[in-house]
């Protein structure tokens, strides 16, 4: 039970589907409180609703910006950030501009992240690199840029692309960053075995929409 609680405290309980209903969001919030997940991660439109439910529970409120493509203006991402903070978000998962990164416009990527970090005023910033679209060398470069730009986490994927997390990807990221940087594994994580394996090789946080199933598996073992 104790180990299960420790693992629950590393999970961002997530529902980012465009067709998510209010009833589903309410259940997500209730489950997060029950299992003591680290946070709930929802689209910005749900922040106020979720915040009212989880207030005082110890569950953090996470949202996404520039999601899921990352291909919006920095000014748009900053606007989304400000509105998300206004509505209670304490953790922000932002998508980097994948196309610019592929074109090796690393300075633009870095400057955007720095602006987001500065405007976040100490709130947790996780930068999504969409590992399924990157080769090993690109994952290494992206990881270093994100750390140097002051973000708190490198996040593997949106869950809306062609690949999620793997232990191999976590190892690549881990070998590219210092011990001060953290990693969030996300995308296709649906079993307790996956969670345990990802944590073992260096993931600090898990993003999953199957968190309740994962916890039930852990508690049954």
Segments the model singles out, each with a brief description of its role:
Residues 51, 72-83, 134-145, 168-175, ...:
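Catalytic cores of alpha/beta
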Residues 63-68, 86-101, 148-163, 185-195, ...:
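Glycine-rich phosphate-binding active-site loops on the catalytic face of alpha/beta enzymes
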